[in-house]
């Protein structure tokens, strides 16, 4: 039995919702985890990605130590384009390669007042969850280290 009966687990319905999702919902889907340093600093695990964030690819063909700036967030295709992640086309021109945000970690955030508010709000709700005992003891110890 499913835990929440009002949410469907039908594959075709979920695919339909994914591909027909409006832009404001796609924004949330296009979230990336924060690096360990940022996670310690802000007490937030992930954030919706935006242009001018600095990211590092951690999965796939382009993974490596190089850190690049997000050039474009293409919500329609569910991909982001990163500064140094390019390939050459047959005619010789270089194009950016689309990468899904779940395959990168954010190493530097572009902060403005709205984004700072989001970080504070997320950290606050995480703190409330910790007080309720939502996270295991090991997780709490790791977060404090």
From Swiss-Prot:
There is a cross-link at residue 136 (Glycyl lysine isopeptide (Lys-Gly) (interchain with G-Cter in SUMO2)). GO terms for cellular component: cytoplasm; intracellular membrane-bounded organelle; large ribosomal subunit; organelle membrane. The keyword Transferase does not apply. The keyword Secreted does not apply. Pfam families: KOW, Ribosomal_L26. PROSITE patterns: RIBOSOMAL_L24 (PS01108). Keywords: Cytoplasm, Isopeptide bond, Phosphoprotein, Ribonucleoprotein, Ribosomal protein, Ubl conjugation. GO terms for biological process: translation. Ufmylated by UFL1 in response to endoplasmic reticulum stress, promoting reticulophagy of endoplasmic reticulum sheets. Its main location: cytoplasm. Residues 1-21, 118-145 are annotated as: Disordered. Gene3D superfamilies: 2.30.30.30. The modification Phosphothreonine is found at residue 139. It is found in: Cytoplasm. GO terms for molecular function: RNA binding; structural constituent of ribosome. Component of the large ribosomal subunit. Interacts with DHX33. PANTHER family: 60S RIBOSOMAL PROTEIN L26 FAMILY MEMBER. Belongs to the universal ribosomal protein uL24 family. Component of the large ribosomal subunit. The ribosome is a large ribonucleoprotein complex responsible for the synthesis of proteins in the cell. This is Large ribosomal subunit protein uL24. The gene is RPL26.
């Amino acid at each position: 039995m499913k835990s929440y009966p009002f949410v469907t687990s039908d594959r075709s319905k979920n695919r339909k919702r994914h591909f027909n999702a409006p832009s404001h919902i796609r924004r949330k889907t296009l979230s990336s985890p924060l690096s360990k340093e940022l996670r310690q600093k802000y007490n937030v695990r992930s954030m919706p990605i935006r242009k001018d964030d600095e990211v590092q690819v951690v999965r796939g063909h382009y993974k490596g130590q190089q850190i690049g700036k997000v050039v474009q967030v293409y919500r329609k295709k569910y991909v982001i384009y990163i500064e140094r992640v390019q390939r050459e086309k047959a005619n010789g021109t270089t194009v950016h390669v689309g990468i899904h945000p779940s395959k990168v970690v954010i190493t530097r955030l572009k902060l403005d007042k709205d984004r700072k508010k989001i970080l504070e709000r997320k950290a606050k709700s995480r703190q409330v969850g910790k007080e309720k005992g939502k996270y295991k003891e090991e997780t709490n110890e790791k977060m404090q280290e």
